[in-house]
């Protein structure tokens, strides 16, 4: 895993020294040696590199990384440029079109959001090839719980977007006297029609940011020239 060089450094290095994380690292060494694991090691902490602690405005919580070759690059819901946009993200784009009138882009690369203060955080940061949730019990949940707790300690408000039961289980770590929670159904094709479409969480997040005197998120992902 690459070294963090922004203001997450102090927070995360404290985690890295804890017993559970030392065990997690040992497990990962074995997993990467014996199986095909995503994302590439250098990308595991990508979300933290791209969105410094002090600049987090919105946390968009995912579950575990995409588990097919070339998809995952350390940002929840995002895929590399040359990869077909996955179904959940297609549904997010449909909601953005309906909510904010944005066009649906030809790629699923969400780094633009990260650079504006949207922490695209999965609750589990690695996965075996073709085995969803295969790393959900190796220690990542403790790590991401502590990341959420550290953001909760901030005085500056954070908007937490929690879709699906896995994300909503983190609600208990968030003080709603200071912070904001937008929660609902997961954008997966299995559940999107049960309340994800029409949730308007993207415009609602911007409305909150505007009221806080913060710059709104430009949610439009641009087309990539092919």
From Swiss-Prot:
Main location: cytoplasm
Enzyme class: hydrolase
Active site, UniProt feature: 64
The organism of origin for this protein: Fusobacterium nucleatum subsp. nucleatum (strain ATCC 25586 / DSM 15643 / BCRC 10681 / CIP 101130 / JCM 8532 / KCTC 2640 / LMG 13131 / VPI 4355)
Gene that this sequence comes from: ung
Keyword DNA damage: yes
Gene Ontology terms: cellular component: cytoplasm
Listed EC numbers: 3.2.2.27
The protein's name in its UniProt record: Uracil-DNA glycosylase
Molecular function terms from GO: uracil DNA N-glycosylase activity
Classification of source organism: Bacteria, Fusobacteriati, Fusobacteriota, Fusobacteriia, Fusobacteriales
SMART domains: UDG, UreE_C
């Amino acid at each position: 895993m690459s070294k963090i060089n922004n203001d997450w450094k102090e927070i995360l290095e404290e985690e890295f020294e804890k017993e559970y994380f030392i065990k997690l690292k040992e497990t990962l060494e074995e997993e990467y040696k014996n199986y095909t694991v995503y994302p590439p090691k250098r990308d595991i902490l990508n979300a933290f590199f791209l969105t410094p602690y002090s600049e987090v405005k919105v946390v968009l919580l995912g579950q575990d990384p995409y588990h097919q070759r070339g998809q995952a690059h350390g940002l929840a819901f995002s895929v590399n440029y040359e990869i077909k946009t996955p179904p959940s993200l297609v549904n997010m784009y449909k909601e953005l079109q309906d909510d904010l009138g944005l066009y649906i882009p030809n790629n699923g690369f969400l780094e633009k959001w990260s650079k504006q203060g949207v922490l695209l955080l999965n609750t589990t940061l690695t996965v075996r090839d073709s085995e969803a949730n295969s790393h959900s019990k190796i220690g990542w949940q403790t790590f991401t719980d502590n990341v959420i707790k550290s953001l909760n300690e901030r005085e500056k408000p954070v908007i937490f977007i929690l879709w699906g039961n896995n994300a909503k289980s983190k609600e208990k770590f968030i003080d709603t006297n200071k912070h904001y929670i937008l929660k609902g159904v997961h954008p997966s094709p299995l559940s999107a029609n049960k309340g994800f479409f029409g949730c308007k969480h993207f415009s609602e997040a911007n409305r909150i940011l505007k009221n806080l005197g913060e710059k709104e998120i430009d949610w439009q992902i641009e087309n990539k020239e092919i």
